[in-house]
């Protein structure tokens, strides 16, 4: 069996505040865009995925220490393996490096 990787991206609407959506709903918005970019549906990708790597910075802004697992659960990726990566300003890049 050979390794297969997904390369895609999605971003939620950027605004100073989004009182209309929870943190988890914003993650789903970005995730849905990334999945659509691949020509798949969320449910199908969740079937194909073996696990996930989540990066989130910073706990203090959302007042939530478990944001990564909350997002993973909301996206339907539990109980698949997943872990969280943080590294200050390098958090996003470290997430891609870790997933590789």
Language model segments and positions:
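Active-site-proximal alpha-helical scaffold in enzymes
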Residues: 87-100
